[in-house]
Structures are given as structure tokens and as C-alpha cells.
Amino acid sequence: MSEGVDLIDIYADEEFNQDSEFNNTDQIDLYDDVLTAASQPSDDRSSSTEPPPPVRQEPAPKPNNKTPAILYTYSGLRSRRAAVYVGSFSWWTTDQQLIQVIRSIGVYDVVELKFAENRANGQSKGYAEVVVASENSVHKLLELLPGKVLNGEKVDVRPATRQNLSQFEAQARKRECVRVPRGGIPPRAHSRDSSDSADGRATPSENLVPSSARVDKPPSVLPYFNRPPSALPLMGLPPPPIPPPPPLSSSFGVPPPPPGIHYQHLMPPPPRLPPHLAVPPPGAIPPALHLNPAFFPPPNATVGPPPDTYMKASTPYNHHGSRDSGPPPSTVSEAEFEEIMKRNRAISSSAISKAVSGASAGDYSDAIETLLTAIAVIKQSRVANDERCRVLISSLKDCLHGIEAKSYSVGASGSSSRKRHRSRERSPSRSRESSRRHRDLLHNEDRHDDYFQERNREHERHRDRERDRHH
């Protein structure tokens, strides 16, 4: 029992010590304080408004605390925004040219220059981003650079923002749409001009005279070829119909048929060629418009140009005949025609007989000279364009070619020809030169008249020498 009492006393002491160390009243007071502190704010809010001012004063430092963060982000944006977009210049502008223009306004701290390029071909889009080292340089660029002219175009300068970037990109697309059909020709890089040309198709031709004409002139001369470039090789197709000259030469004596023949052979080209004429609308196409006015004169477009065209492609004789083709039918009567033809036949037959006899005797130069003289006389007659006259001329030419071939084959080996040349004080080289001159003059119709006069004088001198030799 005593041990139990001791124990009880001990526990009682401990409990007492605990009570002494941790007083229940204090604990109760503490809890009461906490409870009262928790209950007081609600009473204060409902009763008085003094505590809120400190609460309102506490957010005040928060902006002060956030101010450095805002300034920091703004300074970062400023470092990014120390750049501008410079645009509306031509695609062939170089970085050196752009830097020179920037330096001309007093900005020397260009850090970087980025050109916007087309991914397809690497071509400049006409604008670039200019990065500078200071905000002051940005202000200078925005204020002073827009008035500058670069390669004939006024430069457009805007801050480096997404909105301005999209605007410059849209302008570049418009310029690209205008430039694509013209191939590699320098485009009109000014944004206003490009927008005008995109809105109205007539502006490229109207902008031929305005300012910056030296830059706009190459593109503005070619607006009509926006579609035909793919069809331009067709300009080489009209010559294929030219092979019909042979039928023309056969029916040249009758004036009415050639126009019909030309029109039939040249009917396919008309739907191809009018696009190249550009200015005149290909509405109702008369027979004259199937010809290219750059090569054929328009006044003679009804019947004249087709014969001239084909005569130029054919021999000079046909060309010469085409010039004389007009007058004979209207000025020569039936009786006069028959008389001239009778005289031409006599000239042809006598010239052939004399040439054959001279060639058989070895005097090839005289034979050639006789035939050339006869050909010249018949071709200068008023009925030279008639089919019968051309038959006479062709027979004379055949005889001439045969004698020339024979003279070349014989050469200088014939003793009789050598003696005749020596007696006439002519060397074989001179004889060959004379025959060569005959042949050249025969194929050169423009000098036909001079040749005829020269042949007459030479023929007279030759006859005088022959007469002196025989007497």
C-alpha cells in the first residue's frame, strides 16, 4: 500500500510539476487570444475602415516591384525593335546600295541587313530588315529615309512589326504577280505602281511616260506580250508556206490568179499572227493582216506584198520581173505585143545560132557575150513578164550554161583559142576573169542596166578589133 502511495505521490508530484510548467490558465488565455484575434478582424471590417488603408498600401509596393520587370521586358523589346523594314525598292538593289543610302542620312551603326528573298529562285522581294545599334538611329531612319530614292524608286520605311511585315509581304506578292508573266525583265518595284498595275490592266501602257520612266519603260513596252511569249516561236512558222513560189512563177503571167493562190496558202497563219500585232484588234481580218508589218509595207497589202515576199525568196529575175509586172498588161496592145514578141524571137534565134557557131570555133567568150546581150535585150522589153518571153530567156540561159561548161572543160588547152587570145592581146586569165564577170553580172539583177551598157561598149570594141584584124 505504501509503495502504491509513493507511486501516487510521485505521479502527483509530476502532475503538479506539469501544471507548474504548463499552466492551464495560460493555455486557456492563449487560446482565448487566438480566438479573439480571429474574431476581431471580422468585427473590425464591419465596424471600422481603418485596417483597409494598410491593405491598400501594400499593393502599392507591388507595382514598384513589378516596374523593374516591365522595364526589363520593354528594354528587351527595345533591343529587338532597334530595327526597321525598308521596302518598295527594286529586286536588283544590292546591300551596298542600301547601306550607302542609309549612311547618307547620318546612320552609321547598321548591325545587320536581311533581305527578304523568294524561296523558289532566291530573288529579292523588294524589302529588307535593317538592324541598328541604337534607338536614335531607328528614329532617324523613320524620319529621314522615306524621302530617299533608290534605283529610281522612293524608299518606304516602317517599324519592324508583324503588321508592317505582312504589308511588305503583300506588296511583294503583287509585284511578283506583275513580274511573273514578263520573265526576267526588271519589274516596276514601286508599291503604288505595282498596285495600280494589279488593279487595272491598262496602267502599264499609261505609265510609259510618267516619272521614273527609265525604270518603268522596259516593262511598259511589253504589256501586250503577257500572253504571247509562249507563242512567240510561232513567228517562225509563216516562212513554211513560202515553198509555193514555184506555182507562182508558173502562173506569173496572169495577174488575177496569184492573189487567190497567196490567200489560200497563207490562210493558216492568220489565227496565229494577230496576237503578235498586239495593238490592232484581230476582229475582221482582211487578207492584208496575215503579213507582219515589220517586214512588209502595209500600203501594198492587197496584192503587192505577197508577190514581193515570194520574189525576194526566189531568184533576182523574178524579183526584177515583179517590178515590171504592173505596166505591161495595161500599156501594151495586141499588135504591139505581137511585134515585140516577133523581134524577141528573132534576137533569141540569131543569138543562139551565133553563139553555137562561135563556141564550135573555140571563141567561147564571144559566144557567152552574145547570149548575155540577147538575154539583156529581151528582159528589157515591155513584154518581158510574159510566159513566152520567159521561155525564150530560159532557152538562152540553157545555151549559155552549156557553152560555159564546155569552155571550162576545154580550158586553156585549145591551141586555136590561145592563138585567138594572143592575136587579140588577151591572156587566158583575162578570159576567165571576163567569163566570171559575165556570170556574176548575170546573177546580179540590180546592176543589169550598167552591165548592158558595158557589154554594148565592149561588143563594139570587139567588132572594131575583129574588123582591123581581118583588114
Curated annotation (Swiss-Prot):
What are the Phosphoserine sites (modified residues) in this protein? S205, S413, S423
RRM domain location: 82-162
How is the protein modified post-translationally, according to the record?
Answer: Phosphorylated.
Q: Where is the signal peptide?
A: none
Stretches the record annotates as Disordered: 34-68, 176-220, 409-471
User: In the UniProt record, does the keyword Chaperone occur?
Assistant: no
Q: Where is this region: Arg/Ser-rich domain?
A: 418-469
The GO terms describing molecular function are: RNA binding
Record InterPro entries: CPSF6/7 (IPR034772), CPSF7_RRM (IPR034773), Nucleotide-bd_a/b_plait_sf (IPR012677), RBD_domain_sf (IPR035979), RRM_dom (IPR000504)
Pfam families in alphabetical order: RRM_1
Oligomer and partners:
Component of the cleavage factor Im (CFIm) complex which is a heterotetramer composed of two subunits of NUDT21/CPSF5 and two subunits of CPSF6 or CPSF7 or a heterodimer of CPSF6 and CPSF7. The cleavage factor Im (CFIm) complex associates with the CPSF and CSTF complexes to promote the assembly of the core mRNA 3'-processing machinery. Interacts with NUDT21/CPSF5.
Query: What family is this?
Result: Belongs to the RRM CPSF6/7 family.
This protein is called what?
Answer: Cleavage and polyadenylation specificity factor subunit 7
Gene name of this polypeptide: Cpsf7
